[in-house]
């Protein structure tokens, strides 16, 4: 089987799960709210909720997680090894500006493409690059 066909079949197989995980992150209004900051949630409850969702997803996919006082978190493949490969992403968003004609915190499809707050920066990439 050609590699491109294998990749296409794999994407078709996992896309519903990937889309569900992205939708769960998009659904979190993770705009910084320093007035509501608290221990473990220094950026406010929205970013804390988004971090919790991302960590839950990582654990569900078999990764080990670490939360450093709500400021930063990471997920790691279990086991040991000399090599390190890191991907960096964030799951908070800036406030939704004007121009949204639908709920920005609901993943929708428009003209065959997914649309939602934080989809490209950085919720989608955070799901796709654990």
Which role does the model predict for each range below?
Residues 124-128:
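Short amphipathic alpha-helical face segments that pack within enzyme cores
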Residues 2-119, 123:
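Acidic/His- and Gly-rich active-site-bordering loop/insert found
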